[in-house]
Amino acid sequence: MKVIIIGLGLIGGSIAKQLIKNTALQVFAYDSNSISLKNALNNSSIHGEIDNLDQLNSKEYENSLIVIATPPKASLEILRSLHSLFNSSVTITDTSSIKLPVEKILIEFDSPNNIILSHPIAGSHNSGEQNSLDSLFLGKNVIVSALPSVNEEHIQKVNILWESLESNIINLDSKTHDHIFAHSSHLPHLVSYALLMTLQDLNKENISEFSGGGFGEFLRLASSSPEMWADIFSLNQENLNSSLDSFIDNLNQLKNSINEDPENIKSLLTSLKIFKEENY
């Protein structure tokens, strides 16, 4: 089977490397960045390149698996551009961390039977093909979501992909996915950016000289790809706003406790410590 990866960034590049390492599948890639393609070819991370996406309509790529591994908004545009392959022998999946906008496109096209949504829960604050790894997905969870219209053979091909990368498959519907990740991933990144904004206001003070490991770890998320996270914040706006409202309410509760009732803050922090130990 041929696997065509669209987008050779951290995720796409890592999929390619791990497939080359673990399987005998033929791995091809398309990327608008010729340097990324050249590096992947020179490093034997892919077997060949795709010059343009129209090539994928040829018989040469029948029964292949296409993995869209670009930032979320670009993924939506690419998916639309591949509409001629909907309901074909080609299997299409993605890696986006937002699912409902993708699902809406599928419904718009009468729910094609060959498209399965994927979200590997793996990554790094370092982006780009140059930071890709041949073990990024090892032992990591991957969310897989398929509409009822999808044929079982296409689901199996996507499952084979993630099993080849030694990932753990979890099935989850798009609505639940976007709600959960607004809290578990998108909000923490937003808070990291907010802390950095606060530090920017204090740039006359060299805070980093007086910081411990937790400080750097907290800010690490803000080193992630601005393009990708701008897309995520925008596309998951409703869920993120709800999560952010709750977060702000809790910040205000902590602020009030600090100012008005020092004993209460101790009790609150103790209960939160217990909750964390029992759940996370």
Where are these predicted regions, by residue range?
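Short beta->alpha hinge that forms the Motif I/post-I loop of the SAM-binding pocket
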Residues: 32-33, 70, 95
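Interdomain hinge/lid region at the active-site interface
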Residues: 205-272
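Rossmann-like NAD(P)(H) cofactor-binding subdomain of soluble oxidoreductases
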Residues: 76-130
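Short secondary-structure boundary/capping segments
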Residues: 58, 107, 133-135
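NAD(P)+-binding Rossmann beta1-loop-alpha1 motif at the extreme N-terminus of oxidoreductases
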Residues: 1-61, 65
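Rossmann-like NAD(P)-binding element
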Residues: 54-86, 90-91
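Internal alpha-helical scaffold of NAD(P)-dependent oxidoreductase catalytic cores
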Residues: 134-220
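Residues at the starts of beta-strands that form the adenosine-phosphate
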Residues: 2, 26, 114, 141, ...
